[in-house]
Amino acid sequence: GEKLKIQKNDFVQNTKMSDKALRKAIKDTKQKNPIRILKASKFIKDKYKTDLEKVISAYKEKGYRDARIISDSVTFDKEKNALSIKINVEEGNKYYFGDIKFLGNTVYTDQGLSRVLGVKKGETYNGVLLEKRIADKSKPDAEDITNLYQNNGYLFSNINAVEVKTANDTIDFEIRITEGPIAYFNKITVVGNDKTNDRVIYRELRTKPGEKYSKEELVRTIREIGQLGFFDPEAIDPKFKNVDSGAGTVDIEYNLVEKGSSQIELQGGYGGGGFIGTLGLSFNNFSARNMFNKDAYKPLPMGDGQKVSLRLQASTFFQTYSVSFSEPWFGGKKPVQFSSSISYSKQFLNNFVTQRADKTKSFNIMTLSVGLAKRLTVPDDFFVLSQSLSYQHYDLNNYNTGLFTFGDGTSRNFA
């Protein structure tokens, strides 16, 4: 049905937090504001319920553990054709963190866990922060205690913060930890790659059979697969299968959805005295080894993760052609990218009498280049060492522009 606009958000019985602060907490149920143009003030029931929870979270972040919503109402104003929302809150008292003890930890010391928790005795109670430092569900690679264990093989670990004592305005906590056995990756499979060959994906996997389970490596693998550009990054789904705490093993099945990786560029316009046309083709999952396999043309040989680009740009006074090729795993065993390209451009002088290109007067440039880029391991594998070699050949044919003292000749350059 019709999404109604929100005329006003009112809060009742709030003395510890201002209306402005509480309105800021509700992200998707904003009241009408002529200044705000990027966020619509429309009422959506599901988002409204979520925003009510965010009001309580805002209180918990400021120490008000017992804050709750006593009642809320949504009324319709026929004259303004809009809704008015009233939220009645009970704030409660402000609390502070007391003693925080760790129980069940043998792998990490209390001091090490305290540094990760980042909460100290005497600080204002913050239930949202405490929950995130135990397990931040909004960030899979967050620096929290759960990830600390799971990045070190403890897939079956369980961490809970339990209130054990409340005295006046102080709350004591126990962080109860069940570490469990170390888990190892067992069988690793990939499904859904209808076009891309298995080896292109498996060489990017950081979760290898027999190695200690690591959530960090699992998250990194998802990111690496997404960066290939051949699959929908939002649809990458690692399924945990045959999880066996007794044997300490887990199978991972990566479910993928292929997406189009080729691109076509077609542009046209007027400039520099005439029409300029551009045609570009880019094939980002090419297979050079199948170029002579007629059965692989569907319509082109694809699936090996190589990139081929062709580009043509032309007008009355110039022409440019270029072809490039890159292989991200040169030799197939290590992440060493090989790249090569060739380009040729031809530019004609303008005949000022006829205002046309003089095809007898040209400046030609041919460029060849090759390069290697190796992924390093020190200081980490985000660093790349690259080197390249290029060759240019210049050819002047009756090209007298006044910039040179000559109009004919050739030159070569290596770099």
Model-derived features: positions:
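Interaction-mediating elements
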Residues: 1-228, 233, 242-249, 256, ...
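Gram-negative/organellar outer-membrane beta-barrel architecture
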Residues: 5-6, 19-20, 24-36, 41, ...
